[in-house]
Regions:
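Compositionally biased, low-complexity segments
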Residues: 5-8, 29
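All-alpha RGS (Regulator of G-protein Signaling) helical domain and cognate RGS-like helical scaffolds
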Residues: 39-43, 49-73, 83-84, 98-415
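N-terminal export signals
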Residues: 77-98
Length: 415
């Protein structure tokens, strides 16, 4: 997607789903065996599959009544059996927990998992950079801050909190990669873009918020039963093309409507970024080989979803305004498809059209929500305007590696 041409097929990001298939590393089942096969094996003698321990556990439950009526020795014997059964059902990594009660970790992770976490670290670094620019403005009283507070009085602290969360994500992911003896990510060589001329903090940036093409199709998507993964497309709730989401001149030179339009643009941009992160994390989680990587990806995803829901609600509070120079924010409640109080994800098509509609994140396919799709989408919004060719090569190299990651159990291996 290029410039302001934004269709749902290239808007690659958005919301949260429980993964039904577990990764198959040391902590998971090897191969492609399904649950029915496992249950069948559980009843066979001598099976060493983890599911076979369920058979032993069922045997122990039959002893509960009699064991507690046969005195102390019987109870001790029963408790020993119960402990052994529990240990058998427990993932091996938990049995290796240190004496301080801390849960252990594997010595390392697969290269595919590392590629996934590296791209997510890069995405978080970029997110942190853009959120920091918003924080720099709202931490100072100004007409822009007042316009954001006109949307919701808590906008400044919400922005600060979101910024802090992104810092925590980037720092954790890179620290974890180092802990796993994997290469971390640094984009500092590309911190070359200028701040807004009127930013309270003048420092080189990675992202550009001064010429934004803000996708607002998510506002319709989550209020519809359609799903991009099934080919459904959506228009724009508001047409925001080549507009700043932060002030770019002395704020006294803006009219009241103009500064409100800039604040409204920011509000929709907040949600656009976070719905995208939600879809990205969900899509890449399905490629994780280890339970450890899966835990990290889905846990951070939950934070992204929480962010999106806040900003989805706040964007709906953006007042109708005409900037006077071509940007119009309509009264969204005049359109049944954009009712502002419909903030919960409407049930939509999911997995198969012959199944009931389900409230989920969408899209979640690699084609529409994977790393390359996410990088392509962000580039189309103007977020990287002014960046070097080397930046784009580095970003898309990381993205391609993440998308190529394969759950190792899908090929009969393990991490």
């Amino acid at each position: 997607m290029v410039g302001a041409i934004r269709t749902e097929s290239s808007v690659s990001w958005v919301y949260i789903r429980t993964n039904l298939t577990l990764p198959c590393g040391r902590e998971g089942e090897k191969g492609k065996s399904n649950m029915n096969r496992n249950i069948h094996r559980a009843g066979q003698k001598g099976g060493n599959d983890s599911m076979s321990d369920i058979h032993h556990g069922a045997f122990l439950t039959e002893e509960i009544g009699s064991s507690f009526t046969k005195g102390k020795e019987a109870r001790r014997t029963f408790m020993k059996k119960l402990a052994l059964s529990g240990a058998a059902l427990m993932p091996a990594s938990y049995a290796l927990a240190d004496k301080g009660g801390k849960k252990p970790h594997s010595d390392s992770i697969s290269e595919g998992d590392a590629d996934i976490l590296r791209f997510l670290a890069a995405a978080e670094i970029l997110e942190t950079d853009l959120w920091q620019q918003y924080t720099d403005f709202v931490d100072v009283p100004s007409p822009y801050t007042a316009a954001l507070e006109n949307i919701d009085g808590d906008m400044p602290p919400y922005i600060d909190q979101n910024t802090n969360d992104e810092f925590s994500h980037q720092n954790f992911l890179n620290a974890f990669l180092v802990k796993m003896n994997k290469q971390p990510v640094s984009l500092e060589a590309f911190r070359t873009l200028p701040s807004s001329p009127v930013s309270p903090v003048q420092t080189p940036r990675l992202t550009n918020l001064m010429h934004m093409n803000v996708d607002t199709s998510w506002f319709l998507r989550y209020r519809s039963s359609g799903n991009p993964d099934f080919g459904d497309t959506f228009g724009q709730a508001v047409n925001i093309v080549n507009r700043p989401s932060i002030p770019v001149q002395n704020q006294a030179l803006y009219t009241g409507d103009q500064i409100q339009a800039i604040a409204n643009t920011a509000a929709f941009h907040f949600a656009m970024i976070e719905q995208g992160g939600s879809s990205l994390y969900d899509a890449l989680s399905l490629k994780c080989s280890s339970l450890l990587a899966l835990r990290i990806v889905t846990s951070i995803e939950g934070s992204e979803v929480a962010h999106f829901e806040i900003w989805n609600d706040k964007a709906g509070d953006a007042p109708a305004v005409d900037s006077g120079d071509g940007l119009v924010f309509p009264d969204l409640n005049l359109n049944p498809a954009t009712q502002t109080n419909q903030v919960m994800p409407k049930p939509c098509k999911f997995i198969s059209e012959d199944l009931p509609l389900c409230s989920v994140i969408r899209p979640t396919s690699i084609e529409l929500a994977g790393a390359v799709a996410a990088a392509t989408f962000l580039a189309s919004t103007g977020l990287f305007l002014g960046q070097s060719d080397s930046f784009f090569k580095a970003l898309f190299k990381l993205a391609a590696a993440a998308d190529k990651a394969v759950r190792e159990c899908d090929h009969g291996g393990h991490d």
